[in-house]
Amino acid sequence: MNTNYSDNNHITLVGEVTSEKRFSHEIYGEKFYIFDLSIPRLSGNADNIPITISERLLPENELPIDSKISVEGQFRSYNSYQGEKNRLILTVFAKEITFIENQEEEIPVGKDITTNEVVLDGYICKKPIYRKTPFGREIADILLAVNRSYNKSDYIPCIAWGRNAKFCETVPVGAEIRVIGRVQSREYEKKHEDGTIEKRIAYEVSVSSLEIIDKNTDENEEAVQENQEAI
């Protein structure tokens, strides 16, 4: 595993601020806030991603709604304990923020324009789950453990499609892989034991390319390249 943790986990987002910043936590006198960023898709829809940011990155501690910004950082996870239950919370941890020069222009969207890209280098935590949708599309669910400084790890859910999904069936638990994709938000319904239904939002990486990291096996690298597929 690459011990340069910035290379293990890097994300670039360009979008529009859609919420007021909310206080999250404080560490050694440094306050952190959360806000929501809307990133447009080619389809015309948008992904709404939570961003965690230090007060030290905000000019005059201001972050107006509708501001258009770019964010460089990492896609991270942490556990939220509610009674006896545990939930995996995902957020983008901002390391750099830039206000777009022309705030009046719409955020451009195109295949050659990077507005949502994440690169992760991690380990397969459990056997990928391969399945087909009712429409016959191949999907594989992957849980990736990405090492971070101070002996921490981020557990990132990923979705592979098509040939990448089929290929994941053969990837063993513990394999080190590198994925490139985008972070997406997805609404779903959680049914509780008492029959009530709660609407939730899941955050995950939609994988556009995937490769096994094995410097000693050229055969693996060739096989993975054959399985690279655009979103």
Residue ranges and their predicted role:
Residues 1-231:
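Single-stranded nucleic acid-binding surfaces, predominantly the OB-fold ssDNA-binding core
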